[in-house]
Amino acid sequence: YGPWQRHVSTMLEGNYEQNWVYRPWFPVDVRDNASCHIRMLESTKVKNGERYIAWSTEAWNVESICARIDELLPEIRLQVTEPREVHPERLQARESRYRALWRAADLRNERMVELTGITFRSFDDSLRDCVESLIAIAGTEVLTSAD
C-alpha cells in the first residue's frame, strides 16, 4: 500500500515487502503526472467525461528495484536486500502464474502522449531523484553494505 516512494524508503532501510500477487511496478513520476493534469486542463481536445490514465510502459519487479538503486547510486553503498515475502503459501505456490499474467499486461500511453505531447521521464531518473530526496530531505537512513 502507499505510494512507491514509501516503498523505496523501505528498500533503503533494508526492510521492504514483496508486492501483492507479485505485481510489478508501472511507475509514473509525480512531476509527469502533474504535467499531464495541467496539459489536459489546458487542452481543447479533451471532451467532458473522457478518462485518461498515465501508465508507465516500463514494468519493474520490486526485487530488481533495490539492486537498481545500488547501480544508479553506488556512492550510498546500499546493502541490496530481498523483499520480505508477505503472501500466504497458497499464493506463493502460484507465483509463476501471477508473474506470467503481469508480463502479459500491455499498458500504453499513446492517447496521453498524443493529447499532451508529454515525454515521460525514465524510471532511472525518477528513482535517482526519489532516493536523493528521501536521503537529503526526508532523512531516510540507508542500510549500507560492509563492502
Would you name each region that the model predicts?
Residues V30, P88-G117:
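Conserved C-terminal active-site "lid" loop/helix of NAD(P)H-dependent oxidoreductases
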Residues V8-Y52:
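Alpha-helical substrate-binding/gating segment
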Residues L107, I118-D129:
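Short, charged alpha-helical segments
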Residues C36-E95, F123, D129-D147:
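Mid/C-terminal beta-alpha module of Rossmann-like enzyme folds, strongest
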Residues Y1-W4:
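Flexible, glycine-rich beta-alpha linker
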Residues Y22-W25, T57, A104, L115:
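Short amphipathic alpha-helical molecular recognition features
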